[in-house]
């Protein structure tokens, strides 16, 4: 990842794996997560490339879709006729207590919250967001993470049969997209590197603890730390805010 020349955008699988693992609850990911949501400058900030070169995603046509990412620990590809040997086994997924469908309201609510967490991370991070069709309303592939051979309901999003939960998730997704479009600071043409505008006394990005103090090296390295704040200030590099292609 990051080896293509300027003008190309690339699927950022490091973004996918880091974001999946972070929301699953894995420890020690704060430094890498900060890099991913700020445009993955460690991968793309070279040879004149821009933040949009990073295509940010957590799901694609290969692997679990969003609903199954929060509903299954393991792949269930028996319908493919290969004795579940096909498909990737390291999915960075979490079923939240029950494998597959459940009627438990607490688990269902937690899964919906996690879907929103993942969608918000994709759509509000620096880079080019990519969504998988059907994720916006919770389409399921029944745990199949290699559904290339399924010309049926496993692969067909049911646009006419969306549940109440699905409609709520779709509206949440719509509002996220509207938010991204409304605030150019979310799609700068320059990488966020903590550069400071001395005249205005502002920094393009500040990383904060839950107590709103600046993160220290020790806090970044704390394996038990699970959250931080990201403060963007559009005044730091006003001339660097532009749409792709401008």
PLM regions: where:
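Short beta-strand/loop motif that positions the catalytic acidic residue
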Residues: 140
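A short catalytic or substrate-binding loop motif that flags glycine-/basic-rich loops and adjacent residues
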Residues: 49-51, 220-226, 243
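Acyl/amide activation-and-transfer machinery of modular secondary-metabolite enzymes
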Residues: 148-159
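Conserved alpha/beta catalytic core and glycan-binding cleft of carbohydrate-active enzymes
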Residues: 1-133, 137, 146-150, 184-187, ...
């Amino acid at each position: 990842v990051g080896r293509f020349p300027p003008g190309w955008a690339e699927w950022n699988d490091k973004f996918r794996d880091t974001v999946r693992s972070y929301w699953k609850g894995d420890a020690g990911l704060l430094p890498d997560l900060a890099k991913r949501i700020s445009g993955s400058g460690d991968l793309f900030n070279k040879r004149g490339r821009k933040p949009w070169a990073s295509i940010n995603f957590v799901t694609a046509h290969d692997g679990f879709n969003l609903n199954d990412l929060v509903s299954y620990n393991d792949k269930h590809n028996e319908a493919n006729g290969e004795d579940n040997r096909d498909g990737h086994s390291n999915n960075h997924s979490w079923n939240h207590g029950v494998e597959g469908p459940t009627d438990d309201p607490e688990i269902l609510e937690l899964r919906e919250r996690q879907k929103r967490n993942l969608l918000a991370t994709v759509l509000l991070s620096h880079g080019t967001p990519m969504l998988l069709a059907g994720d916006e309303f919770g389409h399921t592939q029944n745990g199949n993470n290699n559904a290339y051979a399924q010309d049926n309901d496993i692969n067909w999003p049911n646009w006419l049969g969306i549940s109440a939960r699905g409609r709520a998730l779709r509206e949440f997704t719509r509002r996220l997209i509207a938010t991204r479009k409304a605030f150019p600071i979310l799609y700068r043409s320059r990488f966020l590197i903590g550069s400071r505008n001395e005249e205005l006394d502002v920094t393009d990005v500040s990383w904060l603890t839950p107590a709103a103090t600046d993160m220290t090296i020790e806090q970044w390295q704390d394996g038990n730390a699970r959250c931080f704040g990201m403060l963007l200030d559009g005044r730091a590099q006003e001339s660097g805010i532009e749409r792709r292609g401008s």
